[in-house]
UniProtKB/Swiss-Prot annotation:
Part of the 30S ribosomal subunit. Contacts proteins S9 and S11. The keyword rRNA-binding applies. This is Small ribosomal subunit protein uS7. The gene is rpsG. GO terms for molecular function: rRNA binding; structural constituent of ribosome; tRNA binding. The keyword Transmembrane does not apply. The lineage of its organism: Bacteria, Pseudomonadati, Pseudomonadota, Betaproteobacteria, Burkholderiales.
Length: 157
């Protein structure tokens, strides 16, 4: 690793429609091949679908709740001790927590069966808000792994 100064974190501008930084980050996660306009259309389309299906709830609120529900608290990291690999549970840093939740929601939405990506994303976000869906399943799986390997938590990093 270079021993030079630490590279400063780039400031991400809030998205143009809602003025939300998390939504802007999610747009960058959804984006493929530099096609930001396509990612923007998918996300805003999904939020429109959410507001149509659940008019009593704010679409942005549903998005934020879904992201917060999917955030993992602990994960496991492999640590080699005396010729054996142990899965050591560690707490997830806040920045990684957000990144993982966004990535898992994107992956779960991609695996769904609906026609358009906007529909898949809308349904995945609504399910994550209710504590269901592929992304929540992934988070629970990670938490279960950490719980199962709690005995190795004294092998700190």
């Amino acid at each position: 690793m270079p021993r030079r100064r630490e590279v400063p974190k780039r400031e991400i501008l809030p998205d143009p429609k809602f003025g939300n930084v998390e939504l802007s980050k999610f747009m960058n996660v959804i984006m493929e091949g530099g096609k930001k306009a396509v990612a923007e259309r998918i996300i805003y389309g999904a939020l429109d679908l959410i507001s149509q299906k659940q008019p009593e709830k704010d679409a942005l609120e549903v998005f934020v709740t879904a992201i917060n529900n999917v955030k993992p608290m602990v994960e496991v990291k492999s640590r080699r001790v005396g010729g054996a690999n142990y899965q050591v549970p560690v707490e997830v840093r806040p920045v990684r927590r957000l990144a993982l939740s966004m990535r898992w929601i994107k992956e779960a939405a991609r695996k769904r069966g609906e026609k358009s990506m906007a529909q898949r994303l809308a349904n995945e976000l609504m399910e994550a808000t209710e504590g269901r869906g592929g992304a929540m399943k992934r988070r629970d799986e990670v938490h279960r792994m950490a719980e199962a390997n709690k005995a190795f938590s004294h092998f700190r990093f």
